[in-house]
């Protein structure tokens, strides 16, 4: 199978689904950790602007991750659709939590870097730049909305721009690593066939 051809549903082996399951466990742990830190620490800036929205977004993220643990076991819906829904939900929930925490100074925007890298590697790089563009649009919209709604908020478009560039850099790196991995895997299969015959 050439590197540029599409992957059919039958090509998604247990390894793909196991990677998606571990990625979802990471998502569950991050969401749970954010909730625990926001409940236990009175010094955390998490939810500093709108704590109730932060809690709802965090609980929604954890529940959504828990639901997908079951759906991954059932393998419903398909692999690409599950991955896309999970990453887009990460972007949506983290954007809400970022807004509820007072914007970019909370540091929550960096969490999407890990999510984008993981998704890029799991998808074998095919959707990585798409996810980075969605995250960038969401970040810029969140920053603009924060400027309009939070009193005395200083827009940090330069920081948002740098973080957006980091999103694309991580997505591109994941894309390149995934292509390299696929090429190595294909070469190993060819050499395995050569040794057998």
In which residue ranges do the predicted regions lie?
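Alpha-helical transmembrane segments and their interfaces in multipass membrane proteins
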Residues: 32-59, 74-85, 102-105, 122-180
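Generic transmembrane alpha-helix motif of multi-pass integral membrane proteins
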Residues: 92-102, 110-128
């Amino acid at each position: 199978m050439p590197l540029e051809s599409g992957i059919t549903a039958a090509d998604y082996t247990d390894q793909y689904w196991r990677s998606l399951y571990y990625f979802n466990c990471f998502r569950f742990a991050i969401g749970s950790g954010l909730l625990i830190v926001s409940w236990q620490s009175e010094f955390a800036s998490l939810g500093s602007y709108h704590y109730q929205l932060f809690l709802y977004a965090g609980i929604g993220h954890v529940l959504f991750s828990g639901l997908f643990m079951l759906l991954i076991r059932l393998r419903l819906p398909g692999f690409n659709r599950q991955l896309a829904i999970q990453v887009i939900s990460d972007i949506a929930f983290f954007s809400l939590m970022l807004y509820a925490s007072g914007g970019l100074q909370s540091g929550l925007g960096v969490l999407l870097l890990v999510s984008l890298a993981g998704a890029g590697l799991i998808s074998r790089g095919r959707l990585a730049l798409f996810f980075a563009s969605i995250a960038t649009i969401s970040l810029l919209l969140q920053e603009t909305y924060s400027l309009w709604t939070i009193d005395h908020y200083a827009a940090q478009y330069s920081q948002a721009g740098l973080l957006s560039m980091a999103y694309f850099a991580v997505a591109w790196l994941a894309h390149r690593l995934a292509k390299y991995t696929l090429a190595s895997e294909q070469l190993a299969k060819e050499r395995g066939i050569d040794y057998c015959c």
